[in-house]
Amino acid sequence: MSEDSPPPDSPQPPTIAVDAMGGDHAPAEIVAGAIAAAADHGMSIVLTGRPSQLRPLLAADRGGGDIRVAPADELVAMDEGALASWRRPRSSVAVACQLVRRGQAAAVVSAGSTAGIVATARLRLRSLPGLLRPGLAVALPTGPKPTLLVDAGAIADPKPEMMVQFAHLGVAYAQVAYGVEDPRVGLLTIGAEPAKGNKLARRAHELLAAAPHGGQPIRFTGNIEGSDLLAGKVDVVVTDGFTGNVALKTIEGAGGFATELTRAALQGSQAARFGTLFQRRALRELAGRMDSETYGGAALLGLEGTVVIAHGDSKAKGIASACRLAADLARGHITERIRERLGPSHRAGHFLRRQ
């Protein structure tokens, strides 16, 4: 691939580098999702992976979309962690990141191992100057403008200062993706009072309340509890990656549980079936909003490039949604927005030395 990807604000669609070998259903469903994204959203796609496996799948494409293949001989398996990213410089996700670094693609999409993607992206794309750690942001289904959860699993045990930066990442995302002019930021903990929570949460609350730290202001509204995650009270929820990932998986499980309850009710008594039929549409919409195939995945923010991590069991619909999200973030100059939000104090390293 010789030509560079157009700038994000170009009338041409951005080029998305898709890791075709990452995910439980790779490469068939990944390729199908890429074909759908190219056909439905007019974007250019570069699939990274083994040409011998990808070209036969592309041969069935009758849509005529702009899809190319960049050879990658290695892959990071779903059960492998961060070390695999060092051992396999020619993995499909590493090649995708290199395309972005060289300006030949605007964003990366992968459904591979989260730990492997985060490690590879940090190694190949590098963090923005002054950023302590990148954060994983995912949209929660709270209505027309979702609530963003940051961090959803990139850093399990962050420092409090990192959580202030997570707030900046989430604010930039909300502004770019959902047009929220002045996003409200809440800290996820076990009570609304500032003194509630563990040592990490209490210190993070102090720092968020005192922000900005050389960057742009944060509209911090205080603590929120788990019961408020889907209430739409804030636009950005800040937490550590361990808590955030548990919360996200719980919400996903609740969506599946609602679907199973509906199925069970439809097989119950006549009265139960009659009542459920009236609620079926609403329940279907609720389950759809909580479906990982719909929201497109999580954005790994704070790097010199856009990375979207799709759910590991994503099929074609989920991959197409992830490609659309990646294109939207690239068009909205998400990297530059974050760079502006961090401000000179972060870039100068005054906020906290990198750990």
Predicted regions and their residues:
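N-terminal phosphate-binding or glycine-rich loops at protein starts, especially the Walker A/P-loop
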Residues: 2-55
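Glycine-rich phosphate-binding loop
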Residues: 99-118, 196, 201-207, 211-286
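Glycine/threonine-rich beta-strand-loop-alpha-helix active-site module
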Residues: 106, 112-162, 166-167, 172
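Phosphate/nucleotide-donor binding subsite
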Residues: 62-105
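Short, glycine-rich nucleotide/cofactor-binding loops
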Residues: 16-28, 154-164, 309-315
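Glycine-rich phosphate/diphosphate-binding loop of Rossmann-like nucleotide-binding domains
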Residues: 28-29, 44-46, 51-52, 156-226, ...
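Glycine-rich phosphate/nucleotide-binding loop
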Residues: 122-149, 233-237, 241-355
